[in-house]
Amino acid sequence: MGVLASGRRVLAARAQQPGAPANAARVRTIDTSVLRIGFEESGSPQGFPIVLLHGFPDDVRAWDGVVPPLVSGGYRVLVPYVRGHGATRIRDANAPRMAEQAAIGQDLIDFADALQLQRFAVAGYDWGNRAACIAAALHPDRVRGAVLIGGYTIQDTLGAPQPLAPERERALWYQWYFNTERGRLGLAANRRPLCRLLWELWSPTWRFTDETFNRTAPSFDNPDFVDCVIHSYRHRNLGAKGDPRFVDVERRLAMRPKIEVPSIALYGADDGVGGTPPADSPSEREVLTSRIARRVVAGAGHFVPREKPEAVASALLEVMRATR
């Protein structure tokens, strides 16, 4: 299956380093076989664990409004930086910086293994949602329930890409840009202004402040950031080879495996990159076989946990009640 070895449990305090967030004193680290994962932990250590996964371009601050209601509910809340972002590092200095979907999904399982979490609940969006989908589909024994922001987003990275409607292709301009050398150089030279532009385009009704963006922007200074981002968007468009360890996993993902764990699908009504949320369809119900609910969140774009944290927290608590 291409599954990596379980993570080794190593918790440590972290010093400030390039790409570290301003509140680095709150961050802990744990080693897996591939990553040193930076994460924040809140709530009771005895509470049932809930893992919250951010996307690109973002970091753990995306969940600041979601964490408190979960902690009040008695849960243990774990918020890791995904590979290439913030306090998370690829441990081998000579390893290629890859971030295909199978790697991101395995990172979640490795994180849970390193923390000795037999089961957990999960919510994610963007890259984080894809990781949540993959873990729920391939490891249903580990995932109690999931809130999938963006619905089912597992990709077929093996088949020939099919063109979308012109307006959808325009919204994905950044992917075509990243598939060029100019795009790689542009991201390296302009990572903060480019990421801020994506925030503005993807959540057009969200009026975030300079302070909000600046709390997260240092996470884009991670030395693995550019290579991981470029690989992610090239690999999904057949522009880069994947990690040989995940060949079998990508084959399984290309077959659209069902997610049989209880889930709630959330969509931002004003998502500038995902587009207008699709109408409920048999195809989604077919892959989300135990879906509890499907909701379009008014007043939110792509960054739903930042824009409407109460909707995300409420959905998570609903999933937890339904899976007692």
Predicted regions located by residue number:
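Flexible "cap/lid" subdomain of the alpha/beta-hydrolase fold that forms the substrate-access gate
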Residues: A20-A25, R36-I37, P49, H85-A123, ...
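Glycosyltransferase donor-binding loop in the core domain
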Residues: D58, D221, G301-V304
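N-terminal export signals
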Residues: M1-A12
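Conserved acidic functional residues
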Residues: G55, D126, R306-E307
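Conserved beta-strand scaffold positions in the cores of enzyme catalytic domains, especially
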Residues: V27-T29, V77-V79, S263-A265, R294-V296
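Catalytic active-site module of serine/aspartate enzymes centered on a nucleophile-bearing elbow/loop
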Residues: S290-R324
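A short loop-to-beta-strand scaffold at the N-terminal edge of the catalytic core in hydrolase folds
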Residues: S33-E41
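Conserved HGGG/HGGXW glycine-rich cap/lid loop of the alpha/beta-hydrolase fold
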Residues: E41-I90
